[in-house]
């Protein structure tokens, strides 16, 4: 499997850090550096799931977003929101942040934990009490680029859709535009990260071609038009965290011979699952996996994943090698892999991401400036 630890979301955020005079962690993207030059007010607008294939499917070539196209970049591996947005917001790869996937095995809990929520993925049980810090803050704390920019006495903030941010906007074209404009209007130099969780949610529920998805993509474009018109002194960067594909599923629980070799529940992602194998059963697992699923998934040993820098380059976060098992598999096409016995609710989405296809990985960047 080829890895793409270059020209990525990580490098894009390092271009932003460089523009604001903050020390960078990785290489920047030269064509973005050139466009940012001299711009003191910058807004990065991320629409979840709106990768290259979705933009090009639902918008015409002469549309507002596509007519401002600058370059195509890579998401993280796996191309999934928790890994990709964390990498963009820190300027570091998943291996450095510890945020590899939607859910990860946390050894001290002996559970799969949804990092965004501190919830047991397999049972739905909350693992913290109200008011307690998130599990991710304990094991994989991060410093975001808005904090780094603020540290050098320049204004920076995040605006996230409610209820992700409690005082965040509920409506994109009214509250979203107004909240952003009100923040920008009195600033001479600032950075804003604006996040909206559509069209990702609509694609999960309906698949990628559905009219609801097209509606959300066009709504995103209307937001960018409106926000840019109201803030002509600001440079806007349009990006996504990943693309989407329509999916089907295999259930490994239906294969008792291979399922019996697992020592723990599947972890990471349905399109990039990781497997903890019972002692001495690794070769048997490898043989059976390739027999049943080799046409659809690429199986990678833990050692090879580390050597090939599958989850990115840089200094590994303490404990990150404990969150995935003896093998990682990634989808070559339309399939995901589940173990139905382990799911407390059947969240089998019609559209998904986090696999190994170009459609999930590639992100078109558009920049709007005067």
Annotate the PLM regions.
Residues 1-370:
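Feature captures the catalytic ectodomains and active-site-proximal regions of enzymes
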């Amino acid at each position: 499997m080829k890895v793409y630890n270059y020209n990525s979301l990580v490098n894009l955020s390092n271009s932003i850090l460089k523009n604001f005079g903050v020390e960078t962690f990785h290489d920047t993207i030269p064509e973005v550096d050139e466009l940012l030059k001299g711009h003191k007010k910058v807004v990065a607008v991320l629409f979840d799931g709106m990768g290259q294939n979705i933009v090009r499917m639902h918008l015409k070539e002469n549309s507002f977003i596509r007519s401002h196209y600058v370059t195509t970049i890579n998401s993280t591996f796996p191309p999934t929101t928790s890994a990709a947005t964390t990498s963009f917001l820190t300027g570091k790869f998943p291996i450095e942040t510890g945020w590899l996937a939607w859910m990860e095995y946390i050894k001290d809990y002996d559970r799969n934990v949804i990092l965004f929520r501190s919830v047991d993925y397999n049972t739905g049980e909350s693992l913290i009490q109200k008011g307690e810090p998130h599990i991710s803050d304990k094991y994989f704390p991060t410093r975001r680029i808005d904090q780094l920019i603020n540290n050098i006495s320049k204004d920076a903030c995040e605006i996230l859709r409610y209820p992700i941010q409690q005082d965040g906007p509920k409506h994109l074209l009214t509250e979203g535009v107004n909240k952003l404009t009100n923040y920008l209007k009195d600033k001479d130099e600032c950075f804003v990260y604006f996040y909206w969780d559509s069209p990702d949610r609509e694609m999960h529920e309906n698949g990628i071609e559905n009219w609801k998805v097209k509606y959300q993509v066009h709504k995103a474009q209307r937001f960018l038009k409106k926000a840019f018109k109201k803030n002509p002194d600001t440079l806007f960067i349009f990006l996504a965290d990943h693309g989407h594909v329509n999916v089907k599923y295999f259930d490994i629980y239906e294969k008792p011979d291979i399922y019996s070799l697992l020592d723990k529940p599947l972890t990471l992602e349905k399109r990039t699952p990781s497997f903890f194998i019972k002692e001495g059963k690794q070769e048997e697992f490898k043989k059976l996996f390739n027999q049943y699923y080799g046409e659809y998934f690429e199986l990678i040993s833990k050692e090879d994943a580390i050597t090939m820098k599958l989850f990115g380059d840089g200094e590994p976060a303490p404990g990150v090698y404990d969150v995935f098992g003896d093998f990682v598999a990634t989808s070559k096409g339309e399939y995901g892999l589940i173990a139905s016995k382990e799911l407390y609710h059947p969240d089998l989405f019609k559209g998904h991401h986090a696999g190994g296809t170009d459609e999930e990985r590639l992100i078109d960047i558009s920049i709007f400036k005067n």
